[in-house]
């Protein structure tokens, strides 16, 4: 459905495509789907982005099923093209882990593989034309549930939702804490925060610089999950916004712009998945090092 066919202005069209399907508790105590951005905001912490959650879980299930099917069908004979592609991905991730992670853990390679493929699949949804699936959702909402189609919101790219990217980065942050404390102990971990980057030999100067070290190290430590999340979110949100802006143009111009941008965006979605994976490995490697 072209943008011109909507009874929406350009601004309303953009806002509609950048709004999540949100379910939550209203201030009056009722639970409902938000029909406006204001209603979604009023739901506060109880707001659930059903579209982001559904797509991310669904793509995670698809990822597990695909790899399970390939593992079941794997044999020593001539592999299929799909099996060869999966093996190339696994070997690429495994070599990246071996080259970057210097500790000992059987968790890192499967974690890195999950992060890379899962984020890649979520990013890949950005290549689906912006109106296709939301149009189906609006049709179902209007004809099955009697909703106003202009108030049926349905985003299909989970990585354009900061809640998804922050959730993933916070999981990585918990692992960083776990590996840091496991390898260095609580005292060693606290000492690393309190005695770096300034660690003079004079005990008085050392004591005076502990608050400065704590502030600097805590800011650096807490910035890691935030930067991980916002980097992925920002790049994918910007890419989605460009696709939406292209959809507002006349049909004959859309193809001239969307195809080159989609081809370039293939590099972006792959690179963002790779960067998130590599930074996760680097952070966990740093957490596993003893000083």
Curated annotation (Swiss-Prot):
Subunit (UniProt): F-type ATPases have 2 components, CF(1) - the catalytic core - and CF(0) - the membrane proton channel. CF(1) has five subunits: alpha(3), beta(3), gamma(1), delta(1), epsilon(1). CF(0) has three main subunits: a(1), b(2) and c(9-12). The alpha and beta chains form an alternating ring which encloses part of the gamma chain. CF(1) is attached to CF(0) by a central stalk formed by the gamma and epsilon chains, while a peripheral stalk is formed by the delta and b chains.
Localization, UniProt: Cell inner membrane
Signal peptide residue numbers: none
Transmembrane segment boundaries: 50-70, 108-128, 129-149, 161-181, 203-223, 241-261, 262-282
Pfam families: ATP-synt_A (PF00119)
GO cellular component, one term: proton-transporting ATP synthase complex
Matches recorded under CDD domains: ATP-synt_Fo_a_6
Function: Key component of the proton channel; it plays a direct role in the translocation of protons across the membrane.
Protein name: ATP synthase subunit a
GO biological process, alphabetically ordered: proton motive force-driven plasma membrane ATP synthesis
Bilayer topology term: Multi-pass membrane protein
Cross-referenced PROSITE patterns: ATPASE_A
Record's keyword terms, sorted: ATP synthesis, Cell inner membrane, Cell membrane, CF(0), Hydrogen ion transport, Ion transport, Membrane, Transmembrane, Transmembrane helix, Transport
Record NCBIfam families: ATP_synt_6_or_A (TIGR01131), PRK05815.1-1 (NF004477)
Family membership noted in the UniProt record: Belongs to the ATPase A chain family.
HAMAP family: ATP_synth_a_bact (MF_01393)
Organism phylogeny: Bacteria, Pseudomonadati, Pseudomonadota, Gammaproteobacteria, Moraxellales
Alphabetized GO MF terms: proton-transporting ATP synthase activity, rotational mechanism
This protein's record includes keyword Ligase: no
Biological source species: Acinetobacter baumannii (strain ATCC 17978 / DSM 105126 / CIP 53.77 / LMG 1025 / NCDC KC755 / 5377)
């Amino acid at each position: 459905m072209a943008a011109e066919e909507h009874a929406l202005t350009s601004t309303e069209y953009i806002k509609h495509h950048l709004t999540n399907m949100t379910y939550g508790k209203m201030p009056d105590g009722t639970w409902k789907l938000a029909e406006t951005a204001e209603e979604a905001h009023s739901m506060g912490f109880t707001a659930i982005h059903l579209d982001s959650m559904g797509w991310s879980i669904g793509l995670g299930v698809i990822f597990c099923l695909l790899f399970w099917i390939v593992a079941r069908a794997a044999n020593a004979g001539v592999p299929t093209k799909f099996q060869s592609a999966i093996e190339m991905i696994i070997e690429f991730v495994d070599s990246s882990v071996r080259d970057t992670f210097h500790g000992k853990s059987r968790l890192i390679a499967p974690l890195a593989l999950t992060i890379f493929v899962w984020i890649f699949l979520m990013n890949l949804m950005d290549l689906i034309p912006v109106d296709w699936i939301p149009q189906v959702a609006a049709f179902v909402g209007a004809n099955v549930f009697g909703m106003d189609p202009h108030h049926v919101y349905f985003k299909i790219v989970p990585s354009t939702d900061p809640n998804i990217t922050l959730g993933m980065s916070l999981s990585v942050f918990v692992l960083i804490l776990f590996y840091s404390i496991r390898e260095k102990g609580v005292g060693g971990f606290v000492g690393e925060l309190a005695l770096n980057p300034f660690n003079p030999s004079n005990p008085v100067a050392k004591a005076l610089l502990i608050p400065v070290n704590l502030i600097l190290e805590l800011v650096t430590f807490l910035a890691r999950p935030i930067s991980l999340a916002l980097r992925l979110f920002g790049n994918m949100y910007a890419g989605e916004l460009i696709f939406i802006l292209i959809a507002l143009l006349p049909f004959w111009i859309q193809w001239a712009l969307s195809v080159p941008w989609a081809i370039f965006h293939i590099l972006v979605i792959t690179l963002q998945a790779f960067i998130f994976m590599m930074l996760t490995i680097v952070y966990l490697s740093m957490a596993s090092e003893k000083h």
